[in-house]
């Protein structure tokens, strides 16, 4: 059987028998075919057909920046210079305003400069201290241990305060009370015929006396009348608002709105 198969098999070509005649495929063609199989097809603008395009990835360039490293000594010196510079700028920008007066020496008033005829003029001391405190209200300043304020108003005697503030006010009140009392006594004497001495034992006259004293204390100036009027309006304001909330609108105003 094997002999018959060998007889009917076609003859082997001489070119296949000779190994030198086998065509060699170049590596360049193999490499292009290999890339063509994995490449992405791109449409041609001429006939609409797709043609393989080989895209070769490019290496990405990485830029490395070198950061200079400072030594601890340089960093500490830089921080100190920055702190000194900041303090310099702060000191240059801050403007300190302090109270200055020729009579204000070492945190107190020099009482020798307030002497008149060998005696201290306490009225001038009170006025100067009032002006200094008013200036401090408008221009506050910080205190320090180097410049202590040792002045105290307790060094001013009590009679100086009374002479400065109480006596002028008391003179006004006493004068007004005397005028009002004399007018009321004359009015009672003209109506009833009771004299001034007899009025001191009368209950009605004593009541008028207390009314006069209270009026003099509460109404010292003409501006006090406006203050009392404002207080009276304020006490009755909420009552007026409450009554206005419950008041019905007039029929004339409602018809005009319609």
Swiss-Prot record:
GO cellular component: chloroplast; chloroplast thylakoid membrane; photosystem II; plastid; thylakoid light-harvesting complex; thylakoid membrane
Keywords, alphabetical: Chlorophyll, Chloroplast, Chromophore, Membrane, Photosynthesis, Photosystem II, Plastid, Thylakoid, Transit peptide, Transmembrane, Transmembrane helix
Transmembrane segments: 177-197, 199-219
Annotated effect of mutating residue 171 to A: Decreases interaction with GGR
Major location category of this protein: plastid
Induction note: Down-regulated by light.
The name this protein goes by in its record: Light-harvesting complex-like protein 3 isotype 2, chloroplastic
The species this protein was found in: Arabidopsis thaliana
């Amino acid at each position: 059987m094997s002999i018959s198969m060998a007889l009917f098999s076609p003859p082997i070509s001489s070119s296949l028998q000779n190994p030198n005649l086998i065509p060699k495929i170049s590596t360049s063609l193999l490499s292009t075919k290999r890339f063509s199989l994995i490449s992405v097809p791109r449409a041609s603008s001429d006939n609409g057909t797709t043609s393989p395009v080989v895209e070769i990835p490019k290496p990405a360039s990485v830029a490395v920046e070198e950061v200079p490293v400072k030594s601890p000594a340089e960093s500490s010196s830089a921080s100190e210079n920055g702190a000194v510079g900041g303090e310099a700028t702060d000191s240059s920008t801050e403007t300190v305003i302090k109270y200055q007066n020729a009579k204000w020496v070492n945190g107190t008033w020099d009482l020798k400069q307030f002497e008149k005829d060998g005696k201290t003029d306490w009225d001038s001391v009170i006025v100067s201290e009032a002006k200094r405190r008013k200036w401090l209200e408008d221009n506050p300043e910080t205190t320090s241990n180097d410049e202590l304020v040792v002045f105290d108003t307790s060094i001013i005697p009590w009679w100086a305060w009374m002479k400065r503030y109480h006596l002028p006010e008391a003179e006004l009140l006493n004068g007004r009370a005397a005028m009002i009392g004399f007018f009321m006594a004359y009015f009672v004497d003209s109506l009833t015929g009771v004299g001034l001495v007899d009025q001191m034992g009368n209950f009605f006259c004593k009541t008028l006396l207390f009314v006069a004293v209270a009026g003099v204390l509460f109404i010292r100036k003409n501006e006090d009348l406006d203050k009392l009027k404002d207080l009276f309006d304020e006490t009755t304001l909420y009552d007026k608002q409450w009554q206005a909330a419950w008041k019905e609108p007039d029929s004339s105003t409602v018809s005009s709105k319609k």
